[in-house]
């Protein structure tokens, strides 16, 4: 990793931690937060905007010329840039559910190369460069040799229901328990930390998944981001014995694009590991 990326990774870790602490203070005082909507069942609050503004100020204090793209303020994504989701899992955050994340990545040559995800209500911070290693502190620090039986699905409204149900049924048929955490970044952090076997979501945004994608790659978990013409993406972080076929795309993502024809059921994999 180049020296400028080393510097940015240190900054990324510090900023994500600080923004997490900022958001956590507001999470403890939800009665004073005004909730707005950006679209159907798409919520935002002053906490989201203020957290993103803090991240922008902290980045520009050290790298004033760097471009920044955020969920709430957008920006120039055609050059190297920082990518911010100040509170991923806003519905959880506004409901007092502790499964939400601060997700910040750095993108070089249109590829996420650095990422950090804070789970402030779980006292957890994970960060990495895409080539590793994965670093972590707190209650969800990385596990080695884990064999999780839960698989995460992002139940995004733009993912065609028939395709999503097909994917869920396929994972269940292989012995996985399906969970939806309500935060793409939190779920990918759980994959990287060895708590979830994998994660799939269609119709999300790059700021939701870029940092988590980096964490998964750093942890050795295969992860792919598939782009659509409308700017949305699909994220697939799958176990080692699964893969994404070359014909997969975000719009038609379904079971046949994720599984090897001969991929083992989870029960077979776990039995083999116990031998």
From Swiss-Prot:
Binding sites annotated in the UniProt record for Mg(2+) 2: 85, 88, 208
Pfam families reported for this sequence: Inositol_P
Keywords, in A-Z order: Cell membrane, Hydrolase, Magnesium, Membrane, Metal-binding, Plasmid, Transmembrane, Transmembrane helix
Membrane topology: Multi-pass membrane protein
Keyword Chaperone annotated: no
Residues the entry annotates as binding substrate: 71, 87-90, 208
GO CC terms: plasma membrane
Localization per record: Cell membrane
Binding sites annotated in the UniProt record for Mg(2+) 1: 71, 85, 87
Gene Ontology biological process terms, A to Z: inositol metabolic process; phosphatidylinositol phosphate biosynthetic process; signal transduction
UniProt entry tagged with the keyword Glycoprotein: no
One GO molecular-function entry: inositol monophosphate 1-phosphatase activity
Gene3D superfamilies, per the entry: 3.40.190.80, Fructose-1,6-Bisphosphatase, subunit A, domain 1
Domain of life, per lineage: Bacteria
Chain segments annotated as transmembrane: 87-107, 112-132, 178-198
Family in the record: Belongs to the inositol monophosphatase superfamily.
Protein name (Swiss-Prot/TrEMBL): Uncharacterized protein y4fL
Organism: Sinorhizobium fredii (strain NBRC 101917 / NGR234)
């Amino acid at each position: 990793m180049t020296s400028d990326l080393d510097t940015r990774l240190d900054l990324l870790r510090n900023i994500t931690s600080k923004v997490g602490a900022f958001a956590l203070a507001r999470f403890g005082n939800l009665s004073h937060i005004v909730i707005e909507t950006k679209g159907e069942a798409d919520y935002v609050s002053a906490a989201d905007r203020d957290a993103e503004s803090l991240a922008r100020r902290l980045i520009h204090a050290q790298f004033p010329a760097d471009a920044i793209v955020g969920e709430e303020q957008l920006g120039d994504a055609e050059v190297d840039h920082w990518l911010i989701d100040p509170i991923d899992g806003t519905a959880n955050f506004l409901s007092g559910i502790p499964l939400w994340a601060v997700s910040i990545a750095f993108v070089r040559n249109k590829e996420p190369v650095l990422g950090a995800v804070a789970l402030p209500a779980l006292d957890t911070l994970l960060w990495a460069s895409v080539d590793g290693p994965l670093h972590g502190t707190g209650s969800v620090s990385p596990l080695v040799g884990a064999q999780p039986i839960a698989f995460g699905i992002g139940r995004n409204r733009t993912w065609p229901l028939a395709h999503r149900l097909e994917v869920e049924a396929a994972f269940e048929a292989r012995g996985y328990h399906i969970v939806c955490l309500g935060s793409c970044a939190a779920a990918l952090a759980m994959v990287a930390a060895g708590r979830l076997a994998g994660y799939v979501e269609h119709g999300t945004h790059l700021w939701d998944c870029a940092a988590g994608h980096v964490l998964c790659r750093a942890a050795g978990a295969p992860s792919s981001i598939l782009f659509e013409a409308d700017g949305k993406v699909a994220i697939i972080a799958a176990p080692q014995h699964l893969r994404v076929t070359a014909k997969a795309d975000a719009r038609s993502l379904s079971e046949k694009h994720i599984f090897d024809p001969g991929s083992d059921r989870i029960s077979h994999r776990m039995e083999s590991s116990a031998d």
